[in-house]
């Protein structure tokens, strides 16, 4: 019950991490280990024909035998390109159907193109993919993605790579309260308290990359994020006290004071 | 001569090639890659039997760091 279940598979960690923007594969691996993440995103790109083919491969540092690899469609601006990319990813990962769909709409803000995202999701679900989908924090379109058959819906907290945190917690609450699949905040988290807030709202998990990779000490930030996620989840399950806007309520007894 | 467009660039090969032969010539044997030919995936199980034709458009991809 306290595990995150996506497409029938249970995960202990509710933190999902990316592999971009690190100094090298050793740092990538060290940060992922410190984060405790089990689901790790990768991008799919053309090989550099003619360059040294013996260069190390990301999947040697992050082996699919140890991690659930989540190939993404970052950089795709049409449903067709995203679908093509994920067909290649599935071939690359020996038929592994779990994927992260993102269809972007604008190169400056990386906001998702929702009509293309919905179109790609329909095709991918029909082809047997288990689609985790990056999307706008629009409760209606999030529900549409769930109804198409996506296995997790992943609204942005703020712009990709911005570190601006949770800019619209009320939309996230609407999405969470109305969802039957895991809701995972994807993008925008800047520091551990942002991850905690997302989890306190009732999100099932958080996916992040830049907040860890671009911290001054990525490995330490990965550890902080792990704790932030766990703290937020426990606080959500514990149920926070009611807010009292107009009156204080002492924590210590009001009787038995000396001199009374 | 066999002209192939690989990852957007035209390259010439001296003789007939299968996908397996191409992967070998590019130094990718044993590497974790995926191949698309003219818009269709070529599954690993068919690399050895898929004969390439002049003008084929190929995409060869790998996993890289990303979020």
For the regions a protein language model found, what residue spans apply to each?
Chain B
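Ubiquitin-like/PB1-type beta-grasp interaction modules and other compact soluble beta-rich domains
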Residues: 1-66
């Amino acid at each position: 019950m306290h595990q995150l279940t996506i497409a029938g598979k249970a995960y202990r960690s509710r933190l999902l991490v990316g592999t971009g923007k690190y100094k090298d594969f050793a740092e990538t691996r060290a940060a992922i280990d410190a984060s405790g993440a089990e689901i790790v995103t990768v991008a799919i790109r053309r090989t550099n024909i003619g360059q040294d083919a013996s260069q190390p491969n990301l999947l040697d540092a992050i082996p699919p035998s140890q991690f659930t690899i989540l190939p993404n469609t970052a950089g795709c601006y049409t449903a067709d390109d995203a679908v093509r990319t994920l067909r290649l990813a599935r071939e690359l990962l020996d038929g592994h159907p779990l994927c992260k769909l993102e269809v972007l709409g604008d190169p400056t803000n990386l906001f998702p193109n929702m009509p293309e995202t919905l179109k790609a999701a329909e095709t991918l679900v029909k082809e047997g993919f288990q689609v985790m989908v990056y999307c706008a924090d629009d409760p209606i379109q999030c529900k549409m993605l769930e109804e198409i058959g996506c296995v997790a819906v992943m609204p942005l907290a703020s712009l990709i790579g911005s570190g601006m945190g949770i800019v619209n917690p009320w939309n996230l609450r609407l999405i969470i309260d109305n969802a039957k699949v895991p809701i995972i905040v994807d993008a925008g988290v800047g520091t551990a308290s942002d991850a905690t807030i997302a989890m306190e709202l009732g999100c099932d998990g958080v996916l992040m990359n830049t907040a860890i990779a671009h911290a001054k000490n990525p490995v330490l930030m990965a550890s902080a994020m792990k704790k932030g996620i766990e703290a937020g989840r426990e606080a959500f399950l514990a149920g926070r006290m009611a807010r009292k806007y107009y009156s204080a309520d002492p924590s210590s007894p009001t009787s038995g004071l000396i001199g009374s | 001569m066999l002209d192939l467009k690989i990852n957007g660039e035209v390259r010439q090969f001296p003789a007939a090639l299968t996908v397996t032969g191409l992967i070998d010539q590019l130094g990718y044997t044993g590497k974790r890659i995926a191949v698309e030919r003219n818009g269709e995936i070529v599954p690993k199980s068919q690399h050895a039997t898929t004969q390439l034709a002049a003008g084929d458009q190929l995409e060869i991809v790998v996993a890289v760091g990303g979020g």
